[in-house]
């Protein structure tokens, strides 16, 4: 029944924002499953010390796995699901509009997503692939002679064009609202999160588009923008990429903030505490997020004054972030009735994960500590807590919120209440030990490690296996 419903969505060319939003969610689901299976392969290799699945002759496969895992989950799972899915399905409803201003542009954006995905994934089948890491740093990305890097670049450009079109559409829709009684500070934080995300995309996507094209010309037309032996500067690539890369973090998580705020106010039958301050906090985070890209580059030789600036501004982001946490927790206090305990439990999981990830982020924001921890799995544990798991939990919450439209069924509150603690245990097993092994230090992006690290890595693999079993169980339930 579910698969027939999905086929009917993609077989009908429709400009309706809800149909497009649901189509985005299904695309994000299948993209995410492929990316998740890649991470399971990575964790399977790391489950025991020594090379088990990967051999000395096939080490490039490991590089391919974590490269494609990062690209798929960032650009085709989280962005497609949160920005495309939530934005298209919910945003016009929250603004009191019947649809977005340009429905057909929405449809074109949707069709570009699978095109970009196919281009990125097809890079695996060409020669030695393109295991450069998801950041595509030169000179590694410019020195590989195969066409795989070029396919990744064009795939990401296609996804970027789709996001740009959606951003213009959402901002234009916001600017053209003529709803009676429309008051700008009474708009739901969920709607504001889409608006702020759209502005961040319009600010940062032209930069990363330019830098990807510069890499393409370096590779194919000998322009040498990033070739240090010919007056190029590879550090320039890092500055330009992370000027997009750090706002990208908030591009992915801001819609999650909005949906958690919406769910708390809906299912606790209470108005969101501090609605205006929540909007201001998200705006402050979006602004400060554009000013801290250098904290990803502490190991690249930044001078002391520059490190001090980026450290200070990074710590400042904790203030509006703490304000959001305070608003959510206060909304949950003294609740008289809860409509869906399962969804509220997932919202609480989001808050807990974000607090853990934010706390470890304050550690990494310190330049002196980051130099030591930057190339360890501590960083992997941090951004999976604060970004990946937080974004996935908010996406799960939204999917359950519209489950009748998406699946044609309703998952019981008892099932959701059972899934939430199991999911949290799996997440803690998978990513919490990485903080301990990161201090050892255990390097990231390496398929082997000393035998004394086996216990922690086995726990991480056990947690990843639990998440895999949980995902397959839920897929089986909704396919009945």
From Swiss-Prot:
Membrane topology designation: Multi-pass membrane protein
Residues reported in the UniProt entry to bind Fe(II)-heme a: 69, 384
Binding site residues for Ca(2+): 45, 50, 447
Cofactor(s) required for function per UniProt: heme; Cu cation
Keywords of this entry: Calcium, Copper, Electron transport, Heme, Iron, Magnesium, Membrane, Metal-binding, Mitochondrion, Mitochondrion inner membrane, Respiratory chain, Translocase, Transmembrane, Transmembrane helix, Transport
GO biological process entries: electron transport coupled proton transport; mitochondrial electron transport, cytochrome c to oxygen
Binding site for Cu cation: 246, 295-296
SUPFAM superfamilies: Cytochrome c oxidase subunit I-like
Main location: mitochondrion
Cross-link entry 1'-histidyl-3'-tyrosine (His-Tyr), positions: 246-250
Residues annotated to bind Mg(2+): 374-375
GO cellular component annotations of the record: mitochondrial inner membrane; respiratory chain complex IV
Pathway the protein takes part in: Energy metabolism; oxidative phosphorylation
Record-listed O2 binding positions: 250
Cofactor note: Binds 2 heme A groups non-covalently per subunit. Binds a copper B center.
Binding site for heme a3: 382
UniProt EC number: 7.1.1.9
GO molecular function terms attached to this record: cytochrome-c oxidase activity; heme binding; metal ion binding
Transmembrane residue ranges: 22-42, 64-84, 109-129, 151-171, 194-214, 240-260, 278-298, 309-329, 343-363, 382-402, 416-436, 458-478
Swiss-Prot/TrEMBL catalytic activity: 4 Fe(II)-[cytochrome c] + O2 + 8 H(+)(in) = 4 Fe(III)-[cytochrome c] + 2 H2O + 4 H(+)(out)
Record localization: Mitochondrion inner membrane
Entry function: Component of the cytochrome c oxidase, the last enzyme in the mitochondrial electron transport chain which drives oxidative phosphorylation. The respiratory chain contains 3 multisubunit complexes succinate dehydrogenase (complex II, CII), ubiquinol-cytochrome c oxidoreductase (cytochrome b-c1 complex, complex III, CIII) and cytochrome c oxidase (complex IV, CIV), that cooperate to transfer electrons derived from NADH and succinate to molecular oxygen, creating an electrochemical gradient over the inner membrane that drives transmembrane transport and the ATP synthase.
Family: Belongs to the heme-copper respiratory oxidase family.
Subunit-level organization: Component of the cytochrome c oxidase (complex IV, CIV), a multisubunit enzyme composed of a catalytic core of 3 subunits and several supernumerary subunits. The complex exists as a monomer or a dimer and forms supercomplexes (SCs) in the inner mitochondrial membrane with ubiquinol-cytochrome c oxidoreductase (cytochrome b-c1 complex, complex III, CIII).
Protein's name in the database: Cytochrome c oxidase subunit 1
Biological source species: Theileria annulata
């Amino acid at each position: 029944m579910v698969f027939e419903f999905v086929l009917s969505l993609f077989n009908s060319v429709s400009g309706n924002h809800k149909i497009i939003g649901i189509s985005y969610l299904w695309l994000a689901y299948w993209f995410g499953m492929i990316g998740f299976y890649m991470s399971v392969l990575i964790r399977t290799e790391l489950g025991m010390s020594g090379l088990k699945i990967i051999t000395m002759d096939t080490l490039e496969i490991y590089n391919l796995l974590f490269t494609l895992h990062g690209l798929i989950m960032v650009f085709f799972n989280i962005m497609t699901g949160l920005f495309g899915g939530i934005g298209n399905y919910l945003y016009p409803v929250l603004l009191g509009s019947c649809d977005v201003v340009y429905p057909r542009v929405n449809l074109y954006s949707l069709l570009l997503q699978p095109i970009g995905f196919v281009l990125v994934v097809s890079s695996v089948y060409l020669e030695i692939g393109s295991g450069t890491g998801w950041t595509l740093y030169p000179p590694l990305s410019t020195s590989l002679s195969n066409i795989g890097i070029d396919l990744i670049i064009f795939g990401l450009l296609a996804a970027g064009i789709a996001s740009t079109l959606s951003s213009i559409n959402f901002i234009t829709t916001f600017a053209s609202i003529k709803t009676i009684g429309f008051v700008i500070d009474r708009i739901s934080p969920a709607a504001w999160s889409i608006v702020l995300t759209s502005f961040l995309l319009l600010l940062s996507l032209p930069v990363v588009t330019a830098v990807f094209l510069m890499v393409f010309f370096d590779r194919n037309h000998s322009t040498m923008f990033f070739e240090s032996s010919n007056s190029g500067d590879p550090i320039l690539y890092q500055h330009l990429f992370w000027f997009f890369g750090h706002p990208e973090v908030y591009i992915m998580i801001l819609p999650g903030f909005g949906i958690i705020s919406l769910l708390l106010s809906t299912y606790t039958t209470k108005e969101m505490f501090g609605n205006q301050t929540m909007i201001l906090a998200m705006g402050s985070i979006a602004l400060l997020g554009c000013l801290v890209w250098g904290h990803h580059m502490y190991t690249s030789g930044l001078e002391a004054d520059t490190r001090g600036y980026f450290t200070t501004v990074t710590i400042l982001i904790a203030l509006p972030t703490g304000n959001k946490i305070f608003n959510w927790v206060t909304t949950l206090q003294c609740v008289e009735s809860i409509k869906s305990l399962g969804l509220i439990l997932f919202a609480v999981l989001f808050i807990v994960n974000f607090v853990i990830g934010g706390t470890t982020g304050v550690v990494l924001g310190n330049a002196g500590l980051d130099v030591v921890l930057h190339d360890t799995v501590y960083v992997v544990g941090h951004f999976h807590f604060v970004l990946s798991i937080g974004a996935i939990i908010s996406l799960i919450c939204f999917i359950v919120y519209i489950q009748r439209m998406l699946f044609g069924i309703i998952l019981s509150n008892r099932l959701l209440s059972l899934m939430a603690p199991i999911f949290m245990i799996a997440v803690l097993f998978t990513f919490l030990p990485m903080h301990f092994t990161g201090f050892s230090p255990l390097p990231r992006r390496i398929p082997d490690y000393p035998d004394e690290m086996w216990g922690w890595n086995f726990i991480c693999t056990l947690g990843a296996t639990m998440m895999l079993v949980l995902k397959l169980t839920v897929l089986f339930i909704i396919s009945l």
